[in-house]
């Protein structure tokens, strides 16, 4: 019988450590309508799409206050902690930017074909036919996630998203029957 670390989690009181009333002075707070934590592609896409939806409904936009959408990023700016390359399915970008040409996206182009080889030794390469599903990327775009993050952050700022770089979200603030985030 084996023992796993998950069976012995450290004692954490979630209610005290992660949720609480506001503690900072009023003059050090920024009231925002919606706070999005994380400046990766998902958080940035969320901020951009939300700003698109709010642009269609002025009443809701006005009800969210002076800063309707804020994105909290622990790095210097969005993309600063994103290191890898990726295969990107273009469907989300097409939905997010329907009027934009794929040539304008920050990618290195599309994958023209898929081929996977096994190399049993230095002299031999055996193609796997058909290509296993996890390795099928035909039609996907090759991109740098850091470059994509920086590009999306530019579009988010153009859409009116307030980006708080070098800011860590540490606690969810609960006050006056609404959620607040402590940064």
Please describe what each predicted stretch is:
Residues 50-51, 160, 181:
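Generic helix-packing signal
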Residues 23-24, 134, 169, 182:
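A structured beta-alpha segment of the ubiquitous adenosine-cofactor-binding alpha/beta core
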Residues 5-18, 46-52:
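Short coil-to-helix leader/linker segments, especially the first N-terminal amphipathic alpha-helix
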Residues 2-11, 29-31, 61-176:
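Conserved N-terminal/central alpha/beta ligand/cofactor-binding core
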Residues 39-41, 76-77, 183:
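Short polar catalytic/cofactor-binding loops
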Residues 177-183:
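Conserved small/polar residues in nucleotide/adenosyl-binding loops
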Residues 14-31, 56:
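A short, basic/flexible loop-to-alpha-helix module at the beginning of a structural domain
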Residues 29-70:
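N-terminal Rossmann-like FAD-binding beta1-loop-alpha1 element of flavoenzymes
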């Amino acid at each position: 019988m084996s023992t796993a670390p998950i069976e012995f989690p450290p004692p954490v009181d979630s209610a005290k450590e992660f949720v609480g009333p506001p503690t900072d002075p009023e003059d050090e707070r920024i009231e925002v309508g919606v706070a999005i934590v994380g400046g990766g592609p998902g958080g940035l896409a969320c901020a951009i799409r939300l700003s698109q939806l709010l642009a269609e409904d002025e009443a809701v936009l006005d009800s969210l206050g002076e800063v309707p959408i804020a994105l909290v990023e622990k790095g210097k700016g969005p993309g600063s902690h994103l290191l890898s390359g990726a295969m990107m399915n273009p469907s989300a970008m097409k939905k997010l930017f329907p009027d934009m040409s794929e040539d304008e996206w920050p990618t290195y182009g599309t994958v023209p074909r898929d081929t996977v080889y096994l190399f049993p030794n230095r002299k031999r390469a055996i193609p796997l036919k058909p290509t296993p599903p996890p390795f099928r990327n035909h039609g996907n775009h090759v991109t740098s996630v850091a470059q994509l993050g920086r590009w999306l952050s530019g579009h988010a700022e153009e859409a009116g998203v307030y980006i708080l770089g070098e800011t860590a979200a540490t606690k969810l603030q609960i006050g006056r029957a609404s959620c607040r985030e402590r940064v």
